[in-house]
Structures are given as structure tokens and as C-alpha cells.
Amino acid sequence: SAYTEGLFYLNGFLYESTGLEQHSTIRKVRIDTGAVVQKIDLPPEYFGEGIVNWGRRLISLTWKSHVGFVYDLASLKKQREFHYEGEGWALTQDGKQLIMSDGTPELRFLNPETLQETNRIQVTLDGKQVRNVNELEWVKGEIYANVWETNWIVRIDPKDGHVTGVINLGGLLGSADQGLGPDSVLNGIAYDAKGDRLFVTGKNWPKLFEIRLKKRGEPGH
């Protein structure tokens, strides 16, 4: 039931960041039970956003404060801060660099050591900009991204920003979405590369889903 802003899978655990001022956290969660095994609170003035792992570090963004944090991955102790222009929405990595969304149609590429920007691409679908690109995940050479306030995950070519496919997750929650507010949108993608498992969730959602993708028209599984 967390206000999920960032999500990734690592070594059998989910790492999740949650938002809202005075309530933002980063936590390590058992994937089988949902039990929180480790947690830190962000300072109350910060609205937590996306997170990603890089080596022995965990890197996190904040929404409008222009500041991010670097933590020791094992202990979740803060090591340092870094700064960026604009808003911070989400992070992922491709094994060589970090990839950041900021709510615009652009994705930024960051040097994982200096955390300085090295490149940007425009996300487009059929020649039109895709706005509100939110939570990110690197999946089999593509960037998967939630589009805020939609049921979409778009698949983005990291070379040119072109959307190569759209995953429609409308109706995924079913009856479990009753009583959730308008802010409780799809947001959160995590990929277990070794097990080829794809997980999704949303803000305040009571469930995490493992999904398998099929092309439109294929029979269900």
C-alpha cells in the first residue's frame, strides 16, 4: 500500500522508494512475503522519487528539490548528495550509464560515477512526443517506462527514443482498485534478468504483479 515512486529487483529482493513529503522512504522488501527487511526515512522536506543500484551503491532522486542522494547499498547509509536541474522522476541503468526521467518527453543519460549528464533523447510515439515519462526499467536492451496517469508501459529504443511498443495494463488490479484514489496510478517496474520475471505495481496498490507479455490477439495464459 506504499506510494511507490521507484522500484528495482536485486538478488531476490525488491528495493522500493516511496514519495510524499514527510513520508518518503527507501526500503528493501522480501519478494515472497512483502515484508520490509530494511528501511530508511528521507528528511521530511524531501519528496522521494526514483532509485537505482550501481555497484555497491543505491542512488535516489527527489522530485522538485534538485538534489539526489547516494547510499551504501548494503547498509543504506547516506554517502553523499548530488545536484541536477529540473525535476527528478525515475532512474534505471543499462550496465554502462544511468538513465533518468524528469516528467518531460526527454530521458537523460548520466555518468554513474560523476552523476553528470552526458546525453539526452526525446521519447516519441508515431512522431509525437510522449510526455510524463515516469518509472523506468532496463529490460532486454530496451527502456520500459510508465507513462504517468495512464495504464501504459512504453518500450523505448535507447538509441533514438522511438517507442517500439505499448503495453496496456488497464484492468490489471480488477476489483482490488475499489477505494483507491485518483493518484493511485500504475507506477513501478522491476525486472529479474536472471529469472526473466517482470514485476509491476502502482501507487498505493495493495498488490505486486508478475506479468508475462503477449502480442495482441494471442490467446491468454
What are the residue ranges of the model-derived segments?
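Signature of short aromatic-glycine-proline-rich micro-motifs recurring in repeat-based ectodomains
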Residues: 4, 133, 180-191
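Residue-level detector of Asp-centered blade-edge/turn motifs that repeat once per structural unit
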Residues: 9-11, 53-55, 93-95, 138-140, ...
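Beta-strand-rich domains and repeat architectures in extracellular enzymes and scaffolds
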Residues: 1-25, 40-52, 89, 202-206
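Surface loop/turn motifs at the tips and blade-to-blade linkers of beta-strand repeat domains
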Residues: 1, 39-44, 80-86, 121-128, ...
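Short loop/turn segments that connect beta-strands within beta-propeller blades
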Residues: 30-34, 72-76, 112-115, 157-161, ...
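Hydrophobic, well-structured mid-protein blocks that either form specific transmembrane helices
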Residues: 68-126
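Conserved beta-strand positions in repeat-built beta-propeller and related beta-rich domains
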Residues: 15-20, 58-65, 100-104, 145-149, ...
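Blade-loop segments of beta-propeller domains
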Residues: 33-70, 77-88
